């Protein structure tokens, strides 16, 4: 049996290693481009001639631009230097069609200085929507005082169905890049990702590619979007420019395609935005480290869930285990899952929380020795009996909870009242979930104390699932890294560091109360070594 479990774990680890190596090879293929070896099919860079260029940005309500009619010039950068970084904010006139839930497009031209883009055969251009459709985020108000009178009147006029309808939002940022590497491409093996951004011309006997213009869509974040009202005649637009290398350009193209694919597979704008934030707000080298950390996090998540389920599946007795701690973990994980769901947290955080909540519900059934009997549509619950040793454990458990209740209940009630008076929420449900989860996060470590107290009274930690604890500890330290990378509520960040402290206390107890290898444990295993127990003073 042991061999079967070991083989399965080895298989999972082996698949994980192959996946990591394959991903590294794919990433290398993305950022590395083979240069031309010198034969006649080389494609030279037009920028190597240092032409005088001009950058022009126009806006229009049409997705296809045939002429210069019905366009507004919003930015004109004469004597444009591709090596110089800049950022400028301009006011854009919003047409009536756009204010009525229409779309507005930005046309970005890179052309020769002093020549209109429509008259320049060597111009390059890209189009990008300046608006997007999204359901507006519910406004937060004080639940006791209510919102401002104007907000309440506007909300009453708005039909209920309109609250869930997507409306036009303004993208206040337009990020531009030009690839500045004087790279000579091999015409026989052009990268497909870059080729769709390339425009080539014939100059004499050589083929040259015009400057590669790129619009960074990953920089458009949901948190920056502005709802377009019918009174919005002008809106600000920040146009920023920076040069980009070929390797980074190819990586960015692939990331944009990946985000687009997520949206095509049904990911919401919010979930796709969380993925964008990882790439935009993080250094690329740190991002590579994050990938490996995330991969190991998924592996340890799987191994922790597997060993935890295996431990509880075999467990027939609750000797040495705090039932109150099991009930608390179940309550806290369910509340945390509902809280993360209400906060629209990213899927990498939400999915493991949901799986953990389901496992904790199953563990409560095991801890209470509960049997569910279905009689038609109505379930009947039967509870098993406890042995003398289990009842003694329950006494220690109840004693620890009695002391904790004197501190816990006043703090939780006081915190809920304070947040109701001073913090704005979307709804009463949001306040209730936030109050529960703040109690879970802020005082959750107190509910871990009953198990520590039971360990102290029994002078043993042999009854704990140490394999699952070890994998969870690895993930706790990984969560400390993710707390600064992935978007999550502040209270969830603090909880990551709280778990570090608790695990260190468990390690201290494991050192203080070594496993008695001379006795048979609950799995029927025994060892020959005689333990050297360290002295302990009550």
UniProtKB/Swiss-Prot annotation:
UniProt-annotated glycosylation sites, renumbered to this chain: 91, 101
Domain of life: Eukaryota
Transmembrane segments: 11-31, 285-305, 325-341, 403-423, 429-449
Membrane-protein topology: Multi-pass membrane protein
Subcellular location, record wording: Endoplasmic reticulum membrane
Alphabetized InterPro entries for the sequence: CLPTM1
Intervals, Extracellular compartment: 32-284, 342-402, 450-538
Cytoplasmic side: 1-10, 306-324, 424-428
A GO BP annotation: apoptotic process
MF (Gene Ontology): phospholipid scramblase activity
One Pfam family per UniProt: CLPTM1
Swiss-Prot/TrEMBL catalytic activity: a 6-(alpha-D-glucosaminyl)-1-(1,2-diacyl-sn-glycero-3-phospho)-1D-myo-inositol(in) = a 6-(alpha-D-glucosaminyl)-1-(1,2-diacyl-sn-glycero-3-phospho)-1D-myo-inositol(out); 6-(alpha-D-glucosaminyl)-(1-octadecanoyl,2-(9Z)-octadecenoyl-sn-glycero-3-phospho)-1D-myo-inositol(in) = 6-(alpha-D-glucosaminyl)-(1-octadecanoyl,2-(9Z)-octadecenoyl-sn-glycero-3-phospho)-1D-myo-inositol(out); a 1,2-diacyl-sn-glycero-3-phospho-(1D-myo-inositol)(in) = a 1,2-diacyl-sn-glycero-3-phospho-(1D-myo-inositol)(out); a 1,2-diacyl-sn-glycero-3-phosphocholine(in) = a 1,2-diacyl-sn-glycero-3-phosphocholine(out)
A GO cellular-component term linked to this record: membrane
Protein keywords: Apoptosis, Endoplasmic reticulum, Glycoprotein, Lipid transport, Membrane, Transmembrane, Transmembrane helix, Transport
Assigned protein family: Belongs to the CLPTM1 family.
Purpose: Scramblase that mediates the translocation of glucosaminylphosphatidylinositol (alpha-D-GlcN-(1-6)-(1,2-diacyl-sn-glycero-3-phospho)-1D-myo-inositol, GlcN-PI) across the endoplasmic reticulum (ER) membrane, from the cytosolic leaflet to the luminal leaflet of the ER membrane, where it participates in the biosynthesis of glycosylphosphatidylinositol (GPI). GPI is a lipid glycoconjugate involved in post-translational modification of proteins.
PANTHER family: CLEFT LIP AND PALATE ASSOCIATED TRANSMEMBRANE PROTEIN-RELATED (PTHR21347), LIPID SCRAMBLASE CLPTM1L (PTHR21347:SF0)
Protein name: Lipid scramblase CLPTM1L
Species assigned in the record: Bos taurus (Bovine)
Lineage: Eukaryota, Metazoa, Chordata, Craniata, Vertebrata
